[in-house]
Amino acid sequence: TRFLPATKAQPKEMLPLVDKPIIQYAVEEVAASGIRKMVFITAQGKHSIENHFDSASELEKVLEGKGKTELLDKVRKTSELGKFFYVRQQQPPLGLGHAVLMAKELVSDDYFAVLLPDDVMDCQTPCLKQMIEVGEKKDAAVLAVQKTDEDGQKRYGIVKVEPTDDPRISK
């Protein structure tokens, strides 16, 4: 509801941040971290996410015909960021855990990452890649978290952490 009326007809994941939808930043981070298979758990009315990452042959023909090669490359690269799978969440939505569980058959026994494009991480080495490296080094699950104020504690999931010898890693 924070982004209404902008999200009445468009998913918040598709709201633009500079020149591309917010969700594309997350997908680019996943791709830059070496992951090719991406599963989107979507809800009713979010077909624009699928359309965005699908190839667009008609648009490509128009751009090619107009000699707009830079835009053509951007459009093509978007659909080449990974192999995309889409699962529609059942109604009513039953929370994040249920949404993740819906991808179980596609994920199988593989390691996986859950990204929510609510925050965009701007790191020289992608945040997800750093998390993968920590997970492999520690042989453990890894969460990216941030400090929040009292208001945020009412709106977000909260974790209690203990420091370790690495200032970037808490237990």
Predicted features and spans:
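Conserved FAD/dinucleotide-binding core of flavoprotein oxidoreductases
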Residues: 170-171
